[in-house]
């Protein structure tokens, strides 16, 4: 804290020198000097190290350090002491003009400002290692944005009823959007899936009509077709939708992400306007394929993220993979597109779970036949324009950005969370803090981009690193940039190249231990000191090149989760963060404290607000339950030998008298409760007989059930015949049956006496 205050006051002092003259300068300098001197004496002076022999090394010690380049600067006859705090150098007689220091400058571009929503458009920040700079970013939403709304519709057969609703949506939606936009345009595109097996049927009879199961005439399947560019002509939009036919495929997921990426990057084909709010409405009732799904069809070429429309048809559908969620999110943000998922059915929750991975996206559930589609679009748009969030792009190595949103209601939130319920008259402020830990390997100028999500304007932050002294570039002062000339026997190196004979210089002093490599295998030994290698991964440093800033744990692709700096293989977290990866907010430790103020009841460690018990005997959310932690038996186990003192030494007997004198003895009956040892053979036969009897009983029961079922069937058949015989014989039809002729070898003689019947008597059958 003191170092930061000294740096601030030092900058104020030198600013007074540059901006004032005469008595005002003297009074101002004296006032600032007194403050600096008082602060400087309250803490150990790290700038006055005797090992500092150069200006560059001096300025690396801290932001409060300075180097006097005055040629005849001598203090107390003890030699040159050019490195010290700025206040001490002034007190020793060094003129302010002769003090080298690393200042922090923030310059915002006020001239030629073209941004109207995000200001400032450009910021220039000059930093040195260990310093930080602040500036404010303002975001003001405009009234009645121009809006470009592109319908991307899943035209598989199951969406037939929803597509019919689109015929009348254009005119009604344009009337509702007129309340929020002065310029509203609509466009239309369709998608199904990749036109290869196993996503579609390649049978000759179905290749041109995938939805024959629905008794419908369908168009051939396709990956993505751009049907209508963005237009103000609502009638043309309705005609394009009316001409649209459905298609089909055979698997459940669709190729929605493929089509979304093409609709986002094909800016000229779609007709996206730079000044408009860009909305991409995706209508579907199924999930979408993700990256690597195309391996099933033998498609292994990764999606390149470029536009591949030819005659408004996506021509790389069968040769290029589906995009990943990260790639799709990047393209949507780069092209300032907000996505609205209009999903019907149970797949709504699948898309809702994706929203944290797609910044600026919103999911809504549509009713049967898309009856609420217009209201869904309007409500989603109102939510989009009421949220202001920012995202950092083109992260600069060695530079950390900390962004805090200051909402119109006064609330402060992390920049990635942003503010909600923002109206067109509100202004959202973002406090941006830039911290540079070390100088970049390549040096020079870099920049980062702060981008409000969904806005077509950004803020470009230029980073200027102050890693060297001005006296090194001034021929007349170059001799005062170091106290002593280097050893002529040692080679001169420029931190990147060094030509010398390794056998010429001993390397024993460059090893932390004799059995370890020179400079930890990551540097060369020159004159008894390690010169560490340069690497693109980060900075290697330390007396033996044993430290670096890239070997720390990573989280989500960022070292120390982006909330800390890597020093010596361990994460040094920024304020407000903790954990081995700096992944936990500091406030999460409060959830690990019990009512007595103990962290995890003294039996564990707190990791991201959850206790990890280090004592294997303890359990519970706060490791508060430990049934065996205080058992006297385990505590007095060593006293057991005192019960049999015959073979103990005198020292052991003395310990028994002192440590185990008050031990209570509890004798236990060790008589076995079992009358005899277990008979394994008897147990086996018992289990075998019981199992056999149970199986036999099951067989008998099943047999009885089958017999009962057969008897019931025979009985029901007999009852049926009996009921037929009891019917009135007068209503029976003729009983004339088919005559069966047969022959016997010796037919038996049958004598029959049939009396004649009268002609008037009817033939009667007697049964």
UniProtKB/Swiss-Prot annotation:
Cellular localization per UniProt: Cell membrane
Disulfide bonds: 47-65, 55-469, 58-83, 68-94, 211-218, 266-307, 407-419, 439-467, 471-490, 471-493, 481-493, 498-527, 510-525, 519-530, 532-545, 552-566, 560-571, 573-582, 584-608, 592-606, 600-611, 613-623, 626-629, 633-660, 639-656
GO cellular component term, pick one: cell surface
Residue intervals on the Cytoplasmic side: 703-767
Domain of life of the organism encoding this protein: Eukaryota
Membrane topology: Single-pass type I membrane protein
UniProt-annotated binding residues for Mg(2+): 154, 156, 254
Record-linked SMART domains: INB, PSI
Positions of the PSI domain: 46-95
Zinc recorded as keyword: no
Transmembrane segments: 682-702
Positions contributing to Ca(2+) binding: 193, 249, 251, 253-254
GO molecular function, one term: extracellular matrix protein binding
Mutant phenotype after disruption: Embryonic or perinatal lethality caused profound defects in vascular development. More than half embryos die at midgestation, with evidence of insufficient vascularization of the placenta and yolk sac. Surviving embryos die shortly after birth with extensive intracerebral hemorrhage. Conditional deletion in the neuroepithelium results in bilateral hemorrhage at in neonates caused by endothelial cell abnormalities in the developing cortex.
Membrane-side (Extracellular) residue stretches: 22-681
One BP annotation, GO: cell-matrix adhesion
Signal peptide stretch: 1-21
UniProt subunit comment: Heterodimer of an alpha and a beta subunit. Beta-8 (ITGB8) associates with alpha-V (ITGAV) to form ITGAV:ITGB8. ITGAV:ITGB8 interacts with TGFB1.
Similarity annotation: Belongs to the integrin beta chain family.
Domain comment (free text): The VWFA domain (or beta I domain) contains two cation-binding sites: the ligand-associated metal ion-binding site (LIMBS or SyMBS) and the metal ion-dependent adhesion site (MIDAS). Unlike in the other beta integrins, the cation-binding site adjacent MIDAS site (ADMIDAS) in ITGB8 is not functional due to the presence of two Asn residues instead of 2 Asp residues. This domain is also part of the ligand-binding site.
Protein name: Integrin beta-8
Source species: Mus musculus (Mouse)
Organismal lineage: Eukaryota, Metazoa, Chordata, Craniata, Vertebrata
